[in-house]
């Protein structure tokens, strides 16, 4: 394999750590790209976690008493729809050159690791636990023997995990922890509950008490913690309150009483995606809250503003400081790593970390070398050549950013490499003319009096193999265009279950409307997720949905035949139809890849039909769990 993607985009960073004894050595973790290490302040990098079984990372920590000891918690701690999951915690004793799995395999999402300042064998791990299902391993875990054994010291609820912990630098027996109750389903997201809150231990985590004086009694959401390095009696908490509102709370008496300083809270797609809180080691009272734009306060959160971020990617998740430079910040975003030497007035982008998260890719048929296209998480849609006959090879300048926002599915027109289709989230379909540079919005719109179109977060695009200008697109119904998207005709009714998603169970039961729903963090539900057409028979169409349905039409959409995936032996009724493909050689054969991990089921579901969907068989064979 050779890497072929762009050099102008990186990807989502989950954590950053600077070596305490050598500030040229950094460790960077990615939401979907493993762990990377540099020994020259970002000039070059090497991946140090690629041989392990998880690519999604939540947190990294170095032992203060022996920085060669490195701990990595897998599965990033955000509540988003596109979050990767992990398989526990890992330890290295040689600076990341080799790793050993140390347990917590069913944690899925690890948020914070704290190592005792004087004893590398004592470690506390904040485990948020599964996002999509109950149970698993969640809570605060402690080891006193370097990870050989773990003791759960906080948390006993099937939906409540621990999202952050901080330690008093004067007394390692004093710890503060934030619990978080959350659950996401394919249909909805609830980002808070009565299990969320603040807790304190004065005996190294063996016993805990809830901190409630001054904290609102409503259903809290995600909480970020920080402790003042200059005066550790001062503890800060960025708290998500009802319906994604929030506030910055401060205690000046070691957590006994709390005062709301302001309404400071992260926003954008929702606090579930940010809320990491940092206290400056250089300026007393200065705190940073990760957000779409980094929020900074110089008076303990009473007043605040956005850090200057000109020529820098938004969506900030991680921050690191140098011990001897108060104006230096190293920050991780959805677009990679940046550093500033003047507190945000100017930024340097480290463009050499290949971490871009591609949703889907496509190729055209241009000669002599075809081009590649890919839609990415928060880095737009990219175009670049597969090869070149130039002596200098493929350059960064050969890659183009052809569409904005989150890029998703892409498609090309056979025989005409100038026409490309791309989309932004939830069906923002565009046609790109590579020759003229024109970008045209062509999303199908409902007719007057019709309800809105429910487009999936990653809606499917299909160019017909029988007519290059014919385009299919899907919301909850299938649309067809004969003129590259200039006009559209619906060729189906609603092919999904069309449910009222707020009435569906979440956290194990039906919830009232006044609970901690985060509507803005929910994707559309009851949507079409995949489209296919037989290359051997025009109008033989296949549709898959996010609610466990396959639909087949043999007459170009005039009639549809419904298959419940739960009727297929060995397939759960809830399975998400992620991709459906008609066979290239046999007109009667079709394949589908299904996913049920959003119900806590990591089994592979690959199915095949040899009679146009009338009957199916499971063909997953010995494919391993967590891979399809």
Regions found by a protein language model. Give the residues of each.
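Beta-propeller blade termini and top-face loops
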Residues: 1-628
